[in-house]
């Protein structure tokens, strides 16, 4: 009768387990390295973003203290510039606080049934004066869109509409158009916000939801804002367990789309 070598099977099983364990450990090490790199980059970005307005404010104030305060030709202008940079600093801190609360789950979602079209109309009305400065028209893709009821956190979705519409105005063309559209899907409503602005090059699309990511740093910084608007949008959508996507053609325009659960 032929004997069975159990020791060989045990050794093979042990080798397999060790190999799997080593592979898992390597993945964890790589993940930790990736997280550490992300942490370094993130804090470096925060430092850079805060330094810019702080240095500007400091420069204007010191210039005023050195005598410009009594020069009527420039004192008011320097105070205005300092105020603008103070507002930018405030925006960055406020948006960082929003992201921190979203990350930590401190702000649980208040899921309610509401009319998404009505909410969009409210935000459009609020943004019309801002859009008018660039003669941008805020409208719906359909002349008489139907009412759609969804179940979500209403104030968070308001923040999404606001951030995306502000983004479309900021990078929109003079006399351009931003359109909001709603589409029925099986269990969801697809919401799209499209503009005919400057668009985004394909190489930048995977990164536009990253914190502080700027397609063109000098141009974007001159546009103001915190650099966190789209990151906040992504956080809110993911908190709902859903996804957001973006399509863009450079020089033609950009469309953001996200889904919400039907009520």
What are these regions (language model features)?
Residues 104-109, 147-152:
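Conserved micro-motifs of the catalytic ATP-binding
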Residues 168-169:
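Short helix-loop "hinge" at the ATP-lid/N-box region of the Bergerat-fold HATPase_c
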Residues 175-187:
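Short beta-strand/loop element within the Bergerat-fold HATPase_c
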Residues 110-125, 138-139:
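A conserved beta-strand-to-alpha-helix junction within the catalytic ATP-binding
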């Amino acid at each position: 009768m032929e004997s069975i070598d159990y020791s060989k099977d045990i050794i093979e099983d042990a080798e397999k387990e060790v190999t799997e364990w080593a592979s898992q450990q390597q993945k964890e090490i790589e993940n930790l390295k990736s997280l550490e790199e992300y942490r370094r980059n993130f804090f470096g970005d925060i430092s850079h973003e805060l330094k810019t307005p702080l240095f500007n404010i400091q420069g204007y104030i010191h210039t005023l203290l050195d005598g410009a305060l009594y020069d009527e030709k420039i004192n008011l202008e320097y105070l205005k510039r300092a105020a603008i940079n103070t507002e930018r600093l405030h925006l960055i801190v406020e948006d960082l606080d929003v992201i921190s609360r979203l990350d930590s789950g401190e702000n649980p979602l208040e899921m309610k049934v509401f009319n998404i079209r009505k909410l969009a109309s409210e935000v459009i009305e609020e943004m019309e004066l801002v859009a008018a400065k660039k003669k941008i028209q805020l409208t719906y893709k359909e002349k008489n869109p139907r009412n759609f009821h969804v179940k979500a956190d209403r104030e968070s979705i308001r923040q999404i509409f606001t951030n995306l519409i502000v983004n479309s105005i900021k990078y929109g063309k003079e006399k351009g158009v931003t359109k909001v559209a709603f589409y029925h899907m099986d269990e969801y409503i697809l919401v799209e916000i499209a503009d005919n602005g400057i668009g985004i090059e394909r190489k930048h699309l995977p990164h536009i939801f990253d914190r502080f990511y700027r397609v063109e740093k000098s141009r974007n910084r001159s546009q103001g804002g915190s650099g966190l608007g789209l990151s906040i949008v992504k956080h809110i959508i993911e908190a709902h367990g859903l996804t957001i996507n973006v399509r863009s053609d450079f020089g033609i325009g950009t469309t953001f789309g996200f889904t919400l659960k039907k009520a």
